[in-house]
């Protein structure tokens, strides 16, 4: 289902608005520029069979072509490393946060976020973990995105993530 709103208010506002209109027990979020594998939704739903699971994080993969630049290549290496850490964390108990490219939550655990939230995926998933639920990590559900077009774009992305990290510390 698509819920149209003519004015842009940001992703967090869209999530807050959309969640008021959803009646399914599980809600899956992706980024607009993300492609997911065919079995992703099925694999995510299976992870929710464990009642301790409140959020399921999919794996982020970067599509790197031979013609791509160093920014894309470096981003791909970073996400392979990050994915390994998330999988190890989840094996011990719970992943720490979810990436916005592909994650899902139990609808009843969603709490409206501040409209200016920079890292909605991280804040939402950690708030669910703070309620005592596990963030499962599902490597069989993955999202594929293109890497940063150039180093300037990658720098802007990193600055936004750093600012969002600081904002998250204050809010959590």
State where each predicted segment sits.
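Conserved strand-to-helix beginnings and helix N-cap segments that scaffold or border functional pockets
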Residues: 15, 38-41, 148-151, 155
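Nucleotide-activated sugar donor-binding and catalytic core shared by glycosyltransferases
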Residues: 33
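Long helical/loop segments within the catalytic core of UDP-sugar-dependent glycosyltransferases
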Residues: 4, 12-14, 20, 24, ...
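Catalytic donor/gating beta->alpha subdomain of glycosyltransferases that bind UDP-sugars
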Residues: 48-82, 116-120, 125-172
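Short loop->beta transition adjacent to catalytic acidic/histidine clusters or analogous donor-positioning motifs
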Residues: 1
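Walker A (P-loop) phosphate-binding loop of P-loop NTPases
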Residues: 8
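Residues within well-formed alpha-helices
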Residues: 13, 17, 29, 43, ...
């Amino acid at each position: 289902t698509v819920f149209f709103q003519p004015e842009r208010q940001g992703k967090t506002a869209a999530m807050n608005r959309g969640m008021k209109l959803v009646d399914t027990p599980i809600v899956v979020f992706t980024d607009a520029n993300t492609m997911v594998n065919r079995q992703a939704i099925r694999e995510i739903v299976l992870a929710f069979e464990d009642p301790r699971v409140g959020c399921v994080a999919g794996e982020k993969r970067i599509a790197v072509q031979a013609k791509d630049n160093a920014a894309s290549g470096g981003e791909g290496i970073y996400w392979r490393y990050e994915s390994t850490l998330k999988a190890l964390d989840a094996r011990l108990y719970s992943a720490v946060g979810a990436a916005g490219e592909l994650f899902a939550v139990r609808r009843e655990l969603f709490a409206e976020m501040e409209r200016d939230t920079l890292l909605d995926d991280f804040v939402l998933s950690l708030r669910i973990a703070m309620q005592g639920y596990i963030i499962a990590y599902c490597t069989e559900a993955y999202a594929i995105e293109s890497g940063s077009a150039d180093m300037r774009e990658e720098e802007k992305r990193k600055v936004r993530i750093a600012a969002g990290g600081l904002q998250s510390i204050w809010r959590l």
